[in-house]
Swiss-Prot record:
This is Large ribosomal subunit protein uL18. This is one of the proteins that bind and probably mediate the attachment of the 5S RNA into the large ribosomal subunit, where it forms part of the central protuberance. Belongs to the universal ribosomal protein uL18 family. Part of the 50S ribosomal subunit; part of the 5S rRNA/L5/L18/L25 subcomplex. Contacts the 5S and 23S rRNAs. GO terms for cellular component: cytosolic large ribosomal subunit. SUPFAM superfamilies: Translational machinery components. InterPro entries: Ribosomal_uL18_bac-type, Ribosomal_uL18_bac/euk. The keyword Manganese does not apply. One of its GO terms (biological process) is translation. Disulfide bonds: none annotated. GO terms for molecular function: 5S rRNA binding; structural constituent of ribosome. Keywords: Ribonucleoprotein, Ribosomal protein, RNA-binding, rRNA-binding.
Amino acid sequence: MAKPSKKNRTHEKRKVRVRKKLFGTQDRPRLSVFRSAKHIYAQVIIDETGQTIAGASTLDKEAKDKGGFESKVEAAKFVGKLVAQRAKEKGVTKVVFDRNGFLYHGRVKAVSTGARDGGLEF
């Protein structure tokens, strides 16, 4: 069987290291971000109960209705605002940001910026 690439191994190490320290509670749920080559996903999770309170991605109807984005970073910022809006509707204002092993740069940073602009407090 093929050995995972060094890039994937280091990503998994970062992910485990970050998740050891983060835990979403009822008061401060976890805002988790996942990015693929084409899309970005964000969801607000309570780890105590395993519930997902709110979620958004570039595949959502609102994002598609908005039309073509200038860049993936702009789309990620829109997803951040969208997940913040949905979380605030459920009564969540404070979250813990989980970058999910991805470097805090580019699209991951844009999601957090959009969520802050949308009214979530980190």
